[in-house]
Curated annotation (Swiss-Prot):
The gene is yojF. It comes from the Bacteria. It comes from Bacillus subtilis (strain 168). The lineage of its organism: Bacteria, Bacillati, Bacillota, Bacilli, Bacillales. This is Uncharacterized protein YojF. Coiled coil: none annotated.
């Protein structure tokens, strides 16, 4: 993965617009949060292979970035993204990591279902 270049990510987001895609969205404080301080609560949200069609996509901010995908029924939104890549399967993979390198958020878009 490399640091987000807004124009490149915006172009990638637009390539998937107006057709069915699969979304992976994950955010986590990780179990390490409670492990390091038992008063901290572990917080996780995880969605894999949600099939959606979005009609508008925007990347905003100056880093970390936020991405919004406008669907017919509402929005998919991810904030805290710092890196991205388009892999050999043409999937757009975006992530945000905490200063120590631990994953904080991931938003991935694919034309095919992700492996489970």
């Amino acid at each position: 993965m490399k640091a987000i270049i807004k124009e490149d990510v915006q172009a990638s987001l637009e390539r998937y617009a107006d057709r069915p895609v699969y979304i992976h969205l994950e955010t986590t404080t990780g179990s390490y949060s409670a492990h390091l301080n038992e008063k901290n609560m572990t917080v996780v949200a995880y969605i894999r292979n949600a099939k959606v069609t979005y009609h508008q996509a925007k990347i905003k901010g100056n880093g970390p970035y936020r991405v919004g995908l406008k669907t017919e029924e509402g929005w998919i939104y991810a904030e805290g993204l710092t890196e991205y890549t388009v892999d050999e399967e043409n999937r757009l993979l975006m992530a945000g990591h905490l200063p120590g390198g631990k994953l904080a958020i991931s938003l991935q878009i694919s034309e095919k279902p992700f492996t489970v």
